[in-house]
C-alpha cells in the first residue's frame, strides 16, 4: 500500500484516484473547484465530470495542496497541461519544507506551448532538477468512462528508472487494468500527447461525413506523423509508437465518442468554430493546445507533419476544412514508409 496524492479531480483524476483506493492505497484528491471537492466528500460523486458513478468512499478531496501532499509517497499529476508547471512549482516549495522526495507520476498528456516541453521535462525542471529517474509517465487506451466501469484495458508506465516503472506497475495494476513497463519515457509521452491532434482530425472527418476508409487512412498516416516527431525531435524509439501509448491510445481516442478531442473535431467538421466548441465542451480539449506546440516543433526542425499542420491552420488561421482536405489529397506522391 502507498500513500498517493492525486493532483486533479476531473474525470480521469477521480477515476484513477478511486481505482488506486480500490487497490488498497491511501489516496487523497486535490482540486481547485470547491463545489467539486464538497460533492466528493459528502456524496462520493463528481457529477460535474462523471455522471452516474461513485468514487471509492475512502477517497477525500481537498483544495489545500499542502494537506494533499502530506506524507505522500507518490504524487500523481492528472492536470491540464497548462496547469502542470505552476502546481509543480508550488509542490516543490512544500516538499522542500518537509524534505520529502516522492515519486512523481504523470497521467497528463500534452506538450507545453512556448517551451515545447513534455510533462516529464516540466516536472524534472520544477521539482527534481537533474533527476528524471523519479518521473514515471502512464499512457494508453484508457477513457475515464470505461475504466470507471471496470472495463478491461492495458496501459504503459514509462520511466528511465526500471525500478520506479516496476513500482508503479505493481501499485496501479489490478484485474481490469494491466500495466506494462517501458523504458522510453519521451516516446510514451509523445504518443499520448500528439494522438489528441490526430483525434481532432478524425472527428472532423466524421463531422464532414467521411467513412471508415478515410478514418483508417487518417489514423495510419497520423501515426506516421507522431512517430516522425517523436524520433526526430525527442529521440524516441520507433517501436514505442506501435505500443499502448502509440497506436493503442490513438485508436481509442480517434474513434470513441468518449474522446473529447474527437467530439471537438466532429463539431468543427459540422461547421462550429473552435471558440464555440471550447466554450460548450465543459472539459479540456488537450489537442487544441498541443497542436500549437506541434506546429512550432515541426517548423523548427522541418519535420513533415501535414495532418497536424492542417489542423493548426483550421483551428488558428481560419483555414477552410474542405480546402485543407483537397490540398492534402493533392500533395506530391511519396513513399509510404519514411521518417
From Swiss-Prot:
Its EC number is 1.1.1.94. Keywords: Cytoplasm, Lipid biosynthesis, Lipid metabolism, NAD, NADP, Nucleotide-binding, Oxidoreductase, Phospholipid biosynthesis, Phospholipid metabolism. One of its GO terms (biological process) is glycerophospholipid metabolic process. The active site is at residue 195. The keyword NAD applies. InterPro entries: 6-PGluconate_DH-like_C_sf (IPR008927), 6PGD_dom2 (IPR013328), G3P_DH_NAD-dep (IPR006168), G3P_DH_NAD-dep_C (IPR006109), G3P_DH_NAD-dep_N (IPR011128), NAD(P)-bd_dom_sf (IPR036291). It is found in: Cytoplasm. NADPH binds at residues 11-12, 109, 144, 260, 284, 286. It catalyses: sn-glycerol 3-phosphate + NAD(+) = dihydroxyacetone phosphate + NADH + H(+); sn-glycerol 3-phosphate + NADP(+) = dihydroxyacetone phosphate + NADPH + H(+). It comes from the Bacteria. The keyword RNA-binding does not apply. Sn-glycerol 3-phosphate binds at residues 109, 140, 142, 195, 249, 259-261. GO terms for cellular component: cytosol. It is an enzyme of class 1 (oxidoreductase). Pathway: Membrane lipid metabolism; glycerophospholipid metabolism. GO terms for molecular function: glycerol-3-phosphate dehydrogenase [NAD(P)+] activity; NAD binding. Pfam families: NAD_Gly3P_dh_C (PF07479), NAD_Gly3P_dh_N (PF01210). Catalyzes the reduction of the glycolytic intermediate dihydroxyacetone phosphate (DHAP) to sn-glycerol 3-phosphate (G3P), the key precursor for phospholipid synthesis. Belongs to the NAD-dependent glycerol-3-phosphate dehydrogenase family. This is Glycerol-3-phosphate dehydrogenase [NAD(P)+]. It comes from Lactobacillus johnsonii (strain CNCM I-12250 / La1 / NCC 533).
